[in-house]
């Protein structure tokens, strides 16, 4: 009894478990707010209507919609971990190539030239060194009694004339067997010469870049002015933005995240050392370190409260002359009536206050990010050495490349009177009117060069000489790109860095480009009905695209109930973005100016279409086309189960990321089997199968099957009979059958005790 009771208990428990644990099936959801990092090519929008802008970017729609997301997301600002920042470096370089496009090879000019230094009418009175008690010229801060106000006249008094030489050379021109003499004016910084050996000061010179394999000169001088643009995500993609107050270029968990279609307008000014005209500036100083710890690549965003600006000028006029060497080779030279004055840049605003705040922010850095001195008086700003672009403040002003030596201004910020090697000058007299390197000034001398080192590729480019007339540009200084260096003297050097990529990290570092993956999997208790199904066609509503991702921070259950609307948002956004891009490509084709960026825009459109078609193809392969919630016949065999009321789709996707391959494979196999079953069902219901019963070959097959069945039955009967016989033989002889009846003798005497003949019996005979 106890044994049977235990069996019933076990069966009861099993039935209870079976009732409480229902079978779950894989369900496909389309329209879930899930994404992954992407490196797809973004496209640009711009409000500028110049030719370059209209042939490379689509017109700005002025849509700055931003939808907050209740999630946490990692962000990284530098190019090696942020594809959007890496794209900016490549794209802005293309902008340079198209607007200041070198196209004429200058290798024939790598020959010996006879050069004579240009002499002008300007005087060359040596400048006197600044001594204690002498007022420093040209400083805006009127609160300091030792400083005076500034104007252009005061600055230009300390600017020397441009050092240049008139060079002549002979080479074959139109007539190849005869040489012709040509004359070209070079800046002294662009040639190297032997010592003068003649009485008239003629020197043998060569181009300083003669050893370079490819040197080209710009075809035309293109006027360069400010171009602002914004990056936009292609259809099917989005931009996430980190809005955390303490974001410093790297944060594993940014909690204040929003989704946008495009970035804010960014500037395309390329500089070394200082950030000009940046789009991101606040009333505070921020220090960004690469990957959160590096001191080799540091971005300092300056406080906009100090109104930091820089005004650069190139005074005077200039005449540009074309020198035709041969057919198809025209070199633009310049002719001086007198030697021109140097260009210069004047730094305005409260730079001392801004630099003091930078020093204070540096010492506040955590110990794992900064191990230098905590004494702000021992933190100094200095410049680098090496290439001219690294050793100087390098930037482009109205199409001309300025190289400005920062020593005077750095001395002013550091309150020192030293040279670039931190040595005090015994005699601070310079050449000509310019003072020596150990003075403090709020302005610096600049040179304009035609041969520059390319900032994106390892090459050099030669551009046309500076344009005629007066050059001037004013820029807002929004940051600095630096390196933090420590030494044994308990001193921290903040060294201006030529890393151009840091500029784009400052502009785009708060954004990340993501690909929307709207297909999700989760277990439900609903199994697909495998009968005939009608395909439902749905027409999307024209709704906001960013609203689709707005549900990223909500629970899975709440998001799943709105999948129809979310998928419509997604499709409507894709269609609208495609329409905008198609209009841009059409405009570019009309102008016959499908530039490199135009091709990128076209590629972005094709990528979006491919992505949408790929998603639909996957859904169709599982039998889920045009469905927002698609139940399947595939059982859910894994232990993972979602918390529909507490878990977001992003969190759930991270749990099952490794299972997606198995899930999709099983869905494809189930769909294939379902198609086979449906095909067999359709064949049974087909009228053409009725006539197949009159096929003679089919009847032969039926007879064959029947004959084999009869043979099988007979064989089984024989085996059974044989088995029965063998079983009886093994049991031995059987006893007499109890059915045989023995009749007794009626008059048998009692012969007990008398011996009888054994076993003899007989019938009695009657006697009369």
Swiss-Prot record:
GO molecular function: structural molecule activity
Cytoplasmic face of the membrane: 723-768
Region V1, annotated ranges: 115-166
Region annotation (Disordered) ranges: 744-768
GO cellular component, one term: host cell endosome membrane
Transmembrane segments: 702-722
Chain intervals for the UniProt region annotation (V3): 312-344
Stretch list, region Fusion peptide: 539-559
Bridged cysteine pairs (disulfide): 44-57, 103-219, 110-210, 115-167, 232-262, 242-254, 312-345, 397-473, 404-446
Manganese keyword on record: no
Regions annotated as coiled coil: 650-687
Residues the record marks as site: Cleavage: 538-539
Listed InterPro entries: Gp120_core_sf, GP41-like, HIV1_Gp120
Protein role: The surface protein gp120 (SU) attaches the virus to the host lymphoid cell by binding to the primary receptor CD4. This interaction induces a structural rearrangement creating a high affinity binding site for a chemokine coreceptor like CCR5. This peculiar 2 stage receptor-interaction strategy allows gp120 to maintain the highly conserved coreceptor-binding site in a cryptic conformation, protected from neutralizing antibodies. These changes are transmitted to the transmembrane protein gp41 and are thought to activate its fusogenic potential by unmasking its fusion peptide.
Domain notes: Some of the most genetically diverse regions of the viral genome are present in Env. They are called variable regions 1 through 5 (V1 through V5).
General remark: The 155 isolate is from a monkey imported from Kenya.
Protein name: Envelope glycoprotein gp160
Species assigned in the record: Simian immunodeficiency virus agm.vervet (isolate AGM155) (SIV-agm.ver)
High-level lineage: Viruses, Riboviria, Pararnavirae, Artverviricota, Revtraviricetes
Gene encoding the protein: env
